[in-house]
Amino acid sequence: MGKPARKGCDWKRFLRNNWLLLSTVVAVVLGIVIGVLVREYSKLSNLEKFYFSFPGEILMRMLKLVILPLIVSSMITGVATLDSNVSGKIGLRAVVYYFCTTLIAVILGIVLVVSIKPGVTQKVNEIDRTGNTPEVSTVDAMLDLIRNMFPENLVQACFQQYKTTREEVELSEEPGTNSTEATVTAIMTTAISKNKTKEYKVVGMYSDGINVLGLIVFCLVLGIVIGRKWEKGQILVDFFNALSDATMKIVQIIMCYMPIGILFLIAGKIIEVEDWEIFRKLGLYMATVLSGLAIHSIVILPLIYFIIVRKNPFQFAMGMAQALLTALMISSSSATLPVTFRCAEEKNRVDKRITRFVLPVGATINMDGTALYEAVAAVFIAQLNDLDLSVGQIITISVTATAASIGAAGVPQPGLVTMVIVLSAVGLPAEDVTLIIAVDWLLDRFRTMVNVLGDAFGTGIVEKLSKKELEQMDVSSEVNIVNPFTLESTALDNEDSDTKKSYVNGGFAVDKSDTISFTQTSQF
């Protein structure tokens, strides 16, 4: 009689602990079924499609709402609660991990696309083009990345990023001086045939979107400053700790709505797709990308985790299942960040000092899936154009894809912009990016899931490598709790200083027998 009761109890406990994950899986299945049925048996107008996706739009807006307070509070508290030397070591380990896994992903993608050759059997004119090619200068994009790391207005950085564009200037006109504060101009001259020149001015403007890099740099510096043993700084640390905890409670409320939002997100996207024929034409290319993402997430990342941490990587990945499903559905590492925090801290029990410091940085610069996708896409486009890439060009693609994926968060429309940068680096036609835009929305979801998984494994690996420093901080913290004050020696009134000595700080007096008593005043 006892065993069945225990099994029933375990089953109920499993449902209670995983109801959100199970309901999300059910929502995904229902979303696919509803999307296919509505697409097959009902012809919705564009306006009706827009209304149909409204519940999913609400989910996206709620998740994006908590990104800013979560990044700011978690970064500041994560850095402030760590010693400056410890935070430096943790940051270095995280960056080395990010760089190595991204480079491995790029190499894997190139090996697969060169072996499978998805573009050899097709021609450029056989694939329909979709969308427009963004005009991107590699130099300008890199400079914008650095500019966005140092925003001139912190409030503006919360909702806008800096971006430069080039405008052609008529040769007959002298370059004027524009005193408008909103634009920054520079004259650039490019030589063309017949000794003629084209003149450009680089115009600075702002585009919508959180300047994540700028906020992270500011929060990093602020966390280091207030994290020092400074009485007034502790007030700010407590404030941001409270803000972080409050934000996570809001995230818990949002996650209760998540299954409904995901259902309408996936169904709405299926209804919106107009031409499914493009998936057949680009089937081999998509299979190459998805194979690379699968190998990286199922073999490489778990293997690295197992070698370093010596724990079951698949159990760790199961703990991140809710975050991975969310990333798959909403296609945004930053918007998934609240769920990633919750899974890492509550399901996998990763130290909060690690997650708060590592995850915001990882969501910004660790883009394994994106780097793999860009490498595959660049070689695929070269194969479509019957171009044989040299070893030097392949190395260039590897380096550029790695660097571009790391800096993707610092530029608007990161997917297209970084893809154009990679193509331009090896002399491939940038306009051919329009050949793969039609399937990008689907591949983006899978590569975002790989990005989030890489961030999660990173927290576990960095925690293991930083175990000694964290234990030393715990011991130091316990010592401070036992004796939290710096005691100053003094003699109490009406007492013989040779026979009895007290140690006074603030409003406490401690004698040699370690008996604590309140004094009437803190001034002696």
From Swiss-Prot:
Residues holding L-aspartate: S331, S333, T370, V411, R447, T448, N451
Phosphoserine modified-residue sites: S517, S522
The family this protein is said to belong to: Belongs to the dicarboxylate/amino acid:cation symporter (DAACS) (TC 2.A.23) family. SLC1A1 subfamily.
Residues at which Na(+) 2 binds: T364, S405, I406, A408
Protein name in the entry: Excitatory amino acid transporter 3
Cytoplasmic side: 1-18, 83-93, 230-238, 309-313, 345-353, 463-524
GO MF annotation list: chloride transmembrane transporter activity; cysteine transmembrane transporter activity; glutamate:sodium symporter activity; high-affinity L-glutamate transmembrane transporter activity; L-glutamate transmembrane transporter activity; metal ion binding
Natural source organism: Bos taurus (Bovine)
GO biological processes: chloride transmembrane transport; cysteine transport; L-aspartate import across plasma membrane; L-aspartate transmembrane transport; L-glutamate import across plasma membrane; L-glutamate transmembrane transport; transepithelial transport; transport across blood-brain barrier
Domain notes: Contains eight transmembrane regions plus two helical hairpins that dip into the membrane. These helical hairpin structures play an important role in the transport process. The first enters the membrane from the cytoplasmic side, the second one from the extracellular side. During the transport cycle, the regions involved in amino acid transport, and especially the helical hairpins, move vertically by about 15-18 Angstroms, alternating between exposure to the aqueous phase and reinsertion in the lipid bilayer. In contrast, the regions involved in trimerization do not move.
